[in-house]
């Protein structure tokens, strides 16, 4: 009677793949017959759950981890796996992707300790890795911003980052990430201008044609200053006295993030694709990195991380048709609000959930000094119009209003708006009104700004 093959607790890798009985000897008889002696080694086994906290050196030989090099190679490969869509809508999937990338990308938070990211008592980092002055000279190029500081020191290639961003930004992602593109000239034109005229600083600013003040300290009446030559940069605070019935809808068909259509029929017949928030979130991150230090960036990203699960729960079942319907609702609501806001007379600004300004009325332009062309013809974010402290408060307020409290409104007691002239701010009290779509996602934020005259 022939001897039977004795079973062993650990099979070799060849027998394990074939699901056959193996022997304790190495090489086993099966591998010898097939000429596989060189690869006849114990198959790696998974670590038991009850041994998860036991160091490798204290484990028995049979349950120790397999080839460490293979595991590290597998881990490195997984880091570069493309984002797998988890939403039924491509637009929603891209928006979630950029939110995840902002929070987890290597260019921002990989070198930041987890206790600093999730603990509000973490130690402050004295070394600022980002520029804080709001000047064009301090804004780094896009090529430099696409890499973390450590990568710039070691000269690591940025091709993988560009491929990752190009995937998230859609078909035109590679074009948007070219090195020669001046991101902050194209998308962020709101850099304050220096006022070098000393006489312009000392005198009361007004427009003699409409005989009205600026919102600042007043020492005399405009009629007394009629003989003073008005400055070309002066901005009138006079309201439009034209009849509301004669007012036409000021739509901008070439600006996708603003009011594009003048009638509801155009909205329902011409909108055939959803609005992409992805490029807006990406550009917002680039702008914040050029303006704030590391500690502020971490705090803002913490706010983004808090509402990400809520976004997943709401958007996971949305289809592409749902996202198109969202944009139709946005344009239809904006068209309706345009008629209402024009008669209200309160400085008002409307922006999307990624912060892109999509509508301003005449009173807001008169209050801040920024024209509609400045704010709407390029990608402009509401945080560009605020001072640093107001921007920090913005993310906390947005997180609270948009994804926690459903009362629909919030008040910022103090919000300082920046003007085209460096060093000049307008202190306001701001009321936020949040408009949600039928699915519960934040659709738009309507901000009403009332100047605090005594402190302007």
Curated annotation (Swiss-Prot):
Chain segments carrying region Disordered: 123-160
Subcellular compartments: Nucleus
Biased composition regions of type Polar residues, renumbered to the chain: 129-140
PAS domain mapped to chain residues: 333-405
Record has Cell membrane as a keyword: no
PROSITE patterns: PAS, ZN2_CY6_FUNGAL_1, ZN2_CY6_FUNGAL_2
Disulfide bonds: none
Superkingdom of origin: Eukaryota
GO BP, sorted A to Z: cellular response to starvation; gluconeogenesis
One GO CC term on file: nucleus
Gene3D superfamilies hit by this protein: Zn(2)-C6 fungal-type DNA-binding domain (4.10.240.10)
The entry's DNA-binding region: 12-40
Entry function: Transcription factor which regulates nonfermentable carbon utilization. Activator of gluconeogenetic genes.
UniProt name for this protein: Transcription activator of gluconeogenesis ERT1
Organism: Lachancea thermotolerans (strain ATCC 56472 / CBS 6340 / NRRL Y-8284)
Gene: ERT1
